[in-house]
Design a protein with these regions (language model features):
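Hydrophobic/aromatic packing residues within the alpha-helices of TPR/SEL1-like helical repeat arrays
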Residues: 76, 114, 121, 158-160, ...
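Canonical tetratricopeptide repeat
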Residues: 92, 139, 172-175, 208, ...
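N-terminal leader/linker segments that initiate helical-solenoid repeat arrays
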Residues: 2-126
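Register position in tetratricopeptide repeats
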Residues: 65, 99, 103, 146-148, ...
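Helix-start (N-cap) detector for alpha-helical repeat units in TPR-like alpha-solenoids
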Residues: 52-53, 87-88, 131-134, 169-171, ...
Length: 316
């Protein structure tokens, strides 16, 4: 059975500090989703829809073909009122709640549906041989990732279980990379991001690989993947993040002219970035141009009067 793939890759809508860069995906949450359906899910999934009620059975088949998740929730809820442990109703209830949840704009609504998905799928797994076991673990892994940082271990656990059950989604390795990154296990994270890149070498994945190498202290590899991201991407926000990190790497390597070039390109895309003005100030200070450095610190403060770095440079 193939579930809808790569539907929830996210691009943040504002620049964050380096310490938070790895949260891009799926970023993940609070940003626009990029959708790509997997129609094989609906063909193969129909073989597993089952109910003692033939009408309910037919209804779920039709709703699944139509991707009508709201009605699937309603119908399976009705089945579960009569038989709370119906494994097929639990599985499809979980799937439908998950796909409904990730499309919510309200965080409260999103968590409501995600929690319902987890509840149904965990109950389905109480059966010795639940239907669609690998697919259920896959959706559980994604659900726990979307529940937040404190559930990253469970996200990794269930995604690994789904792979062990011979189900590998197009984004399985990306979710594993994200989960291990959230756990601070960057070596494991890198392993799965590289596997993801074998099949889906996207600009976002290149950026994520660059960030992971950066966290591991491998600046040369980080630079390589940042340049790949810049050359491939048509997304200005992603390009901005890649160039900002390139500027930081060049600064650490004392390649100040290269660093200046990247930060100036960031300002062309986002002239109201206080961090970029501040880092340009740092570049000019390192080059011995104190007047220009202070000018950029002041620009950072005009945009963000509480910018800690600029305040420290100007008033300490």
């Amino acid at each position: 059975m193939m579930l809808p793939q790569n539907r929830f890759n996210f691009t943040p809508n504002k620049q964050r500090r380096r310490a938070k860069i790895l949260k891009i995906l799926v970023l993940l949450a609070g940003s626009a989703a990029a959708f790509a359906g997997g129609t094989a899910l609906y063909r193969l999934g129909l073989r597993y829809v089952s109910s003692s009620d033939a009408v309910d059975h037919k209804t779920i088949r039709l709703l699944w073909e139509e991707k009508n998740y709201g009605e699937i929730i309603r119908v399976t809820d009705s089945i579960l009122k009569k038989n709370p442990m119906d494994p097929h109703a639990l599985v499809f209830n979980g799937f439908a709640n998950f796909y409904t949840g990730v499309n919510q704009t309200s965080a409260e609504d999103k968590i409501f549906y995600i929690d319902a998905a987890v509840k149904s799928l965990r109950r389905a797994k109480l059966h010795s041989r639940p239907p669609l076991r690998g697919e259920a673990d896959y959706i559980l892994g994604k659900s726990y990732y979307h529940k937040g940082l404190h559930y990253a271990d469970l996200s990794a656990r269930y995604m690994l279980d789904s792979i062990q059950e011979k189900y590998i989604g197009q984004d399985s390795y990306e979710y594993l990379g994200l989960a291990f990154s959230s756990l601070g296990e960057y070596g494991e994270s890198l392993k799965y991001f590289l596997k993801a890149g074998e099949n889906n070498p996207s600009d976002l994945l290149f950026l994520t690989l660059a960030q992971t190498y950066y966290q591991l202290g491998d600046k040369a590899s980080s630079e390589e993947y940042l340049m790949r991201a810049v050359n491939k991407s048509q997304d200005p926000l992603l390009t901005e993040k890649a160039r900002f990190l390139l500027g930081d790497i060049y600064f650490q390597n004392k390649e100040y002219i290269k660093s200046e070039e990247q930060y100036l390109k960031v300002l062309e895309m986002n002239p109201q970035s206080p961090d970029t003005h501040f880092h340009l100030g740092e570049v000019y200070a390192a080059l011995g141009d104190g007047v220009k450095a202070r000018a950029y610190y002041r620009r950072a403060l005009r945009i963000d009067p509480n910018h800690f770095g600029a305040l420290r440079r100007l008033y300490n």
